[in-house]
């Protein structure tokens, strides 16, 4: 893989999760453009820089030890990538503090480097949080590949920060620079909430939660077919989102024990709040994690999963395949993985390569619900 070479550093970077022979690199031209732009401004060593949504640590690791850097984002895998890439390049583990998106950072900051996220609600929430956290004369510089840069990103920066200047395109990347100006303090519209009829739940969704404004159709197809009569089973909701699968299952299985896992900090925050609202003080475990990688082998009886088919803007089934592998490792012999998936993704054949028995529980014109037994 090529090295990231910028005015600040030459770094050997890897993506997360790691894949053998991964053809994708851990940085792009937007990262290079952001770092070059910052360097051209010649900030001194005391400059406080906040890095937002740094996919695999390219920005923060480049600035580590040179400026006063704080990184924040909603991806646990992004956090893990930053830690691994710091170590991989001989940089101190604690040279870049990381603040999960479920928590608030402490300014003032002189510069903010932003990778424009896929979910504009997350960008809006972050820009609102920046109000009152920026030093006089501060700039917010957002970068993206042009094909992933919506016009609305600049509109949001103008609304919450100040006047925006768009750069020329460079290697198919573009920057938007907002200079701090007087703006009325905004009240965040997040989290949002929607009502589910069966089971009757009011579900809280923080800004970066998948299908924040309503139940996704895959989960809607899955809910009527969740397993019952689980007794004291140990159940994991893998990729839990707002926690609706685990909560619905827990309501039908009062003795079962639940672990809710997602790589999004805001998803886990939403799941925890929704569990508390629906089930009170009933114990459960909530993890922002790399799937089930940290769980002991053969520690679960049931895994529920509505697997994603994209990581940021990259589409594919590699995350789902990895989740299936993790579920197999974590399940006891005889344990079962229940999933929902689009028919065209062919999950049945993939599961058959890992599990001794795969059966179709139900189907709609678009989705299948499958049970795979170890």
Swiss-Prot record:
GO molecular function: 23S rRNA (guanine(1835)-N(2))-methyltransferase activity; nucleic acid binding
Protein's recorded name: Ribosomal RNA large subunit methyltransferase G
Coiled coil: none
Main location: cytoplasm
Higher taxonomy: Bacteria, Pseudomonadati, Pseudomonadota, Gammaproteobacteria, Pseudomonadales
Function: Specifically methylates the guanine in position 1835 (m2G1835) of 23S rRNA.
Localization, UniProt: Cytoplasm
Annotated transmembrane regions: none
E.C. no: 2.1.1.174
HAMAP family per record: 23SrRNA_methyltr_G (MF_01859)
GO cellular component, one term: cytoplasm
Highest taxon, organism lineage: Bacteria
Record field: catalytic activity: guanosine(1835) in 23S rRNA + S-adenosyl-L-methionine = N(2)-methylguanosine(1835) in 23S rRNA + S-adenosyl-L-homocysteine + H(+)
Similarity comment: family membership: Belongs to the methyltransferase superfamily. RlmG family.
Keyword line: Cytoplasm, Methyltransferase, rRNA processing, S-adenosyl-L-methionine, Transferase
Record CDD domains: AdoMet_MTases
SUPFAM superfamilies linked to this entry: S-adenosyl-L-methionine-dependent methyltransferases
């Amino acid at each position: 893989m090529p090295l990231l070479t910028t005015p600040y550093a030459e770094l050997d970077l890897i993506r997360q999760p790691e894949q053998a022979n991964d053809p994708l690199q851990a940085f792009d031209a937007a990262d290079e453009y952001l770092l070059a732009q910052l360097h051209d401004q010649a900030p001194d060593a005391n400059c406080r820089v906040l890095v937002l949504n740094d996919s695999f640590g390219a920005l923060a690791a480049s600035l580590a030890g040179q400026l006063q850097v704080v990184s924040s984002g909603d991806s646990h895998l992004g956090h893990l990538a930053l830690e691994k890439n710091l170590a991989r390049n001989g940089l101190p583990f604690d040279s870049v503090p990381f603040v999960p998106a479920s928590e608030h950072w402490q300014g003032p900051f002189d510069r903010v480097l932003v990778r424009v996220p896929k979910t504009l609600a997350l960008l809006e929430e972050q820009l609102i949080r920046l109000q009152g956290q920026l030093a006089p004369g501060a700039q917010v510089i957002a970068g993206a590949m042009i094909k992933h840069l919506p016009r609305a990103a600049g509109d949001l920066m103008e609304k919450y920060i100040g006047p925006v200047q768009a750069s020329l395109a460079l290697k198919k990347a573009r920057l938007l620079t907002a200079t701090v100006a007087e703006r009325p303090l905004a009240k965040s519209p997040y989290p949002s909430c929607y009502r589910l009829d069966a089971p009757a739940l009011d579900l809280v969704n923080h800004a970066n939660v998948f299908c924040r404004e309503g139940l996704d159709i895959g989960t809607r197809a899955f809910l009527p077919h969740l397993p019952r009569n689980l007794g004291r089973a140990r159940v994991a909701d893998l990729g839990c989102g707002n926690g609706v699968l685990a909560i619905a299952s827990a309501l039908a299985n009062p003795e079962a024990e639940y672990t809710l896992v997602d790589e999004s900090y805001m998803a886990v925050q939403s799941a925890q709040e929704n569990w508390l609202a629906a089930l009170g003080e009933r114990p459960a475990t909530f993890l922002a994690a790399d799937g089930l990688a940290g769980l002991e082998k053969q520690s679960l009886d049931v895994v529920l999963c509505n697997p994603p088919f994209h990581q940021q803007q990259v589409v594919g089934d590699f995350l789902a395949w990895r989740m299936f592998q993790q579920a197999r490792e974590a399940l006891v012999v005889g344990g079962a993985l229940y999933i929902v998936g689009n028919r065209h993704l062919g999950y049945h054949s993939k599961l058959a390569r890992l599990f001794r028995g795969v059966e179709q529980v139900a189907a709609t014109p678009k989705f299948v619900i499958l049970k795979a037994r170890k």
